[in-house]
Amino acid sequence: MKVIFLKDVKGKGKKGETKNVADGYANNFLIKNGYAVEASNAALSTLSAQKKKEDKLAAEELAEAKALKEKMEKLTVELKAKSGEGGRLFGSITSKQIAQTLEKTHGIKVDKRKMDLPEAIRALGHTKVPVKLHHEVTATLDVHVSEE
């Protein structure tokens, strides 16, 4: 029997796949538990429409991320911190502080976990911080730390 998987089934198929499986397995397990539906013409057309919708949504997200990247790479995030001799900070600047300042000053909301800051900034000056906006798009944000 040909079925369309609605959920991932380990060892059998992934969501959205169309596969031939044994009739008993399809009726007694997959269809009964909601893991799959029988592959009729109506179900196949629904699946193709759903895939087109998902592809369109993914393309929109990618375009949005690219536009945000263009905007972010022109910005400089200004932060002030107390520092000692040689430009070393008392404490550090974290991705959370960068995200909050970016939202407050420029109105761009970015999750702090998207910032690829290996360790906190502990010195005055300019630092380039990579920000992962999409799995294909990474922007580089310029962070300037000056003395308070």
Swiss-Prot record:
Q: Which InterPro entries match?
A: Ribosomal_bL9 (IPR000244), Ribosomal_bL9/RNase_H1_N (IPR009027), Ribosomal_bL9_bac/chp (IPR020594), Ribosomal_bL9_C (IPR020069), Ribosomal_bL9_C_sf (IPR036791), Ribosomal_bL9_N (IPR020070), Ribosomal_bL9_N_sf (IPR036935)
Quick check: keyword rRNA-binding in the entry?
A: yes
| Keyword terms | Ribonucleoprotein, Ribosomal protein, RNA-binding, rRNA-binding
Q: Which domain of life is it from?
A: Bacteria
Q: Which GO terms describe its biological process?
A: translation
Q: Does the keyword Lipid metabolism apply?
A: no
What Pfam families is this protein classified in? Ribosomal_L9_C, Ribosomal_L9_N
GO MF, any single term: rRNA binding
Q: Which GO terms describe its cellular component?
A: ribonucleoprotein complex; ribosome
Against NCBIfam families, the record matches this protein to:
L9
- Function recorded in the entry: Binds to the 23S rRNA.
Instruction: Please give the family membership noted in the entry.
Output: Belongs to the bacterial ribosomal protein bL9 family.
Checking HAMAP family in the record gives: Ribosomal_bL9
Q: Spell out the protein name for this chain.
A: Large ribosomal subunit protein bL9
